[in-house]
């Protein structure tokens, strides 16, 4: 994996440390150092990891964060939070505030930064305004946002710029991908597409990032059909070179649009 990422042109790998990921949470102390060593040997960095961490008092979650910090990982993406049945949204948001605040205090002790991804749908933080609210009491140096423009446009439509204006001081990592609305059997659904071929106005978005002077790590996501690679499958149904070609194509397109913005 590391050698392929280097050959494609990436300068780092966003490792998944979660069930069915590159590293299993319960094996983080044994396997994360090995994975990071392989990445380092390929000339790449491990600046960030993607996790299911969500509770500062959970032993496995704490161990993931502590191990990552010891290995000098700078950022981790935490798990998404779900609105519980039987509670009003304001009540649930009070609990979410405490969750992020507690994690931010753990992060501060360990000198690592946690990030919450805005994800479209019914998860907490789908709306940028929601996310801004639940971050209010956290230590903002050590807890922020993995801002995902694809999900922001799905939820924000034409008002995504307002959300970015609001949340940009809290952005720690960027996640980028693209989509279209597609009619499937009479129902309109979100369909992931190759970078730059969808509804995200990347030139306007990148221009705003430059205006805000946002210089943070970027994770390029591949979620359109790639023979199972898009879903993290251990075996895929298309030749791996086809996957690598799409990955390089998207990376070059990202770099091109950034330069043009």
Please report, for each region that a protein language model flagged, where it lies by residue:
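A short acidic, helix-capping loop that chelates divalent metal ions and anchors anionic groups
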Residues: 19-24, 84-89, 155, 184, ...
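Residues that line or immediately flank small-molecule/substrate-binding pockets and catalytic motifs
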Residues: 17, 53, 80-83, 171, ...
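Structural preference for beta-strand elements that scaffold enzyme active sites
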Residues: 12-14, 45-50, 74-77, 111-115, ...
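Short, structured active-site "lid" loops
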Residues: 38-45
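Histidine-acidic metal/acid-base catalytic patches
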Residues: 1-11, 128-143, 147, 153-261
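Active-site acidic/histidine proton-transfer and metal-coordination neighborhood
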Residues: 2-3, 19, 38, 53-145, ...
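Residue-level marker for beta-strand->alpha-helix junctions and adjacent short loops that shape enzyme
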Residues: 18-20, 56, 83, 121, ...
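Glycine-rich, proline-tolerant flexible connector loops at the mouths of alpha/beta enzymes
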Residues: 14-37, 87
């Amino acid at each position: 994996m590391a050698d392929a990422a280097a050959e494609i042109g990436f300068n780092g790998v966003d490792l998944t440390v979660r069930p069915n990921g590159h590293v299993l949470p319960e094996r983080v102390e044994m396997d994360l150092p090995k994975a990071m060593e392989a990445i380092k040997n390929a000339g790449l960095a491990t600046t960030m990891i993607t996790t299911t961490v969500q509770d500062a008092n959970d032993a496995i979650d704490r161990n993931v964060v502590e191990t990552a910090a010891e290995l000098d990982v700078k950022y981790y993406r935490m798990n998404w939070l779900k609105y519980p049945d039987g509670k009003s949204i304001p009540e649930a948001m009070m609990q979410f505030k405490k969750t992020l605040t507690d994690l931010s205090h753990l992060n501060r002790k360990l000198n690592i930064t946690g990030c919450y991804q805005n994800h479209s749908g019914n998860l907490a933080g789908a709306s940028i305004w929601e996310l801004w609210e639940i971050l209010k009491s956290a230590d903002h140096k050590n807890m922020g946002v993995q801002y995902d423009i694809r999900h922001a446009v799905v939820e924000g439509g034409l008002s995504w710029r307002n959300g970015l204006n609001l949340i940009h001081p809290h952005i720690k990592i960027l996640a980028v991908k693209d989509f279209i609305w597609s009619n499937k059997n009479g129902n309109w659904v979100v369909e992931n597409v190759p970078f730059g071929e969808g509804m995200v106005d990347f030139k306007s978005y990148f221009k705003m990032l430059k205006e805000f002077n946002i210089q943070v790590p970027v994770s390029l996501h591949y979620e359109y059909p790639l023979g199972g690679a898009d879903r993290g499958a251990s075996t895929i149904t298309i030749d791996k070179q086809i996957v690598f070609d799409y990955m390089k194509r998207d990376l070059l397109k990202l770099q091109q649009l950034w330069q043009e913005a």
